[in-house]
Amino acid sequence: MSSDRPSGARSNESEPAGRVKARGSELLDALERHLPGSRGHADGTAAYAFAAAVGLDLERDQAEAVREAARLHEVGNVYVPARVLVRLPGELTAEDRELLDARFASGAGLARGAGIPDQVCQWIRASGERFDGRGPAGLAAERIPIESRIVRVACACDSALAAPAPAPGGASSDERRRIAVHALRAAAGSELDPRVTAALATMLERGAPAP
């Protein structure tokens, strides 16, 4: 059965939704203290993930659950030294890569402890997987939940838009979108799901603003 068929997000705690959401916000507060700027990236990733989920015709409640997974997808970064999180890929050691691979499972555990629905926690864990199967658990293509693939592309989208401008003086919004689209399409089929990438890239090409 294709993993593109979404399954409902089930709560692992019989608690009011507002209390659970507040606990999720506490995780983000801790992450922001650990690495300033993380909350902005979480919010941006969540916005792009929701837009992609709606564009791919997921049901509204499923799209909302994807947004929550995207919002919390990097809370496991609190277990990774900040100096490692800001290193460029070519500067990472083998130990650094192990920490970075483990952060998604760690983040899923933190989210589960905060009462986040089990299915959302699974999506957080799988959001570290690569479409080509070279991620932490070796899942590839449709073995990765569609929700996790959406989160991965949304994360890459927000990161690309936030990247420093290549020329002095910065770049216009149109130029940033063009650069982001190029980066997303270049990673499609290797790191990123091509279908999800195409959906978000098309939104950017049509002038969708940053969230």
Q: Can you say where each PLM-predicted feature lies in the sequence?
A:
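Short, low-complexity N-terminal regulatory "tails/caps" that precede and couple sensory modules
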Residues: 1-22
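Histidine- and acidic-residue-rich, metal-dependent catalytic cores
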Residues: 15-211
